[in-house]
């Protein structure tokens, strides 16, 4: 039986920290579905379609990997719908864990068949967050160590920044 996990997030943008957690999950589960949460309360830089395209280019070479969008509804219900037995969450610090632990308990109540699996990224990504990447890129900083080249290109397009040059 195929063990399916879902890896949800906004992924605006998908960072090397996200990729690291995805790769770790891929070593545990037969199939990992990256689920882009469309959250109308968040003001995102990239559209859902842009995020999907970027992530598909990055994870497309992994067996059992796919990208889907959760437009509305509960993650616990989505997990049931796709037959996922696990929800993968990356945890960088204690603050992340506190929030994710609460969400894990809620998801368990809503869907007792799904388990949340907490994975820590490589230590070099523990301070990397999409919001920080967006801000540094917007200010012309070099983020090439924190995102895939295809994401870097899209950030440059969004912020009209030439590679290796700041916008000042």
Swiss-Prot record:
Cofactor(s), names only, from the UniProt record: Mg(2+)
Protein name in the entry: Phosphopantetheine adenylyltransferase
GO molecular function, one term: ATP binding
Protein's GO biological process: coenzyme A biosynthetic process
Binding site for ATP: 10-11, 18, 90-92, 100, 125-131
Top-rank taxon, per record: Bacteria
Annotated keywords: ATP-binding, Coenzyme A biosynthesis, Cytoplasm, Magnesium, Nucleotide-binding, Nucleotidyltransferase, Transferase
EC nos: 2.7.7.3
Gene behind the chain: coaD
Reaction(s) catalysed (UniProt annotation): (R)-4'-phosphopantetheine + ATP + H(+) = 3'-dephospho-CoA + diphosphate
């Amino acid at each position: 039986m195929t063990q399916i996990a879902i890896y949800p997030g906004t992924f605006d943008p998908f960072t090397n920290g996200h990729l690291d957690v995805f790769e770790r999950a891929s070593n545990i589960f037969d199939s990992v579905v990256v689920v882009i949460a469309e959250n109308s309360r968040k003001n995102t830089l990239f559209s859902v379609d842009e995020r999907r395209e970027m992530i598909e280019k990055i994870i497309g070479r992994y067996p059992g990997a796919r990208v889907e969008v959760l437009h509305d509804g509960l993650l616990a219900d989505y997990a049931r719908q796709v037959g996922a037995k696990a929800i993968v969450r990356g945890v960088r610090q204690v603050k992340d864990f506190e929030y994710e632990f609460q969400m894990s308990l809620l998801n368990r109540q809503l869907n007792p068949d799904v388990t949340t699996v907490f994975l820590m990224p490589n230590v070099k990504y523990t301070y990397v967050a999409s919001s920080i990447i967006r801000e540094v890129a917007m200010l012309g900083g070099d983020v090439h160590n924190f995102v895939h080249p295809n994401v870097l290109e899209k950030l440059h397009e969004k912020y009209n920044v030439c590679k290796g040059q700041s916008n000042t």
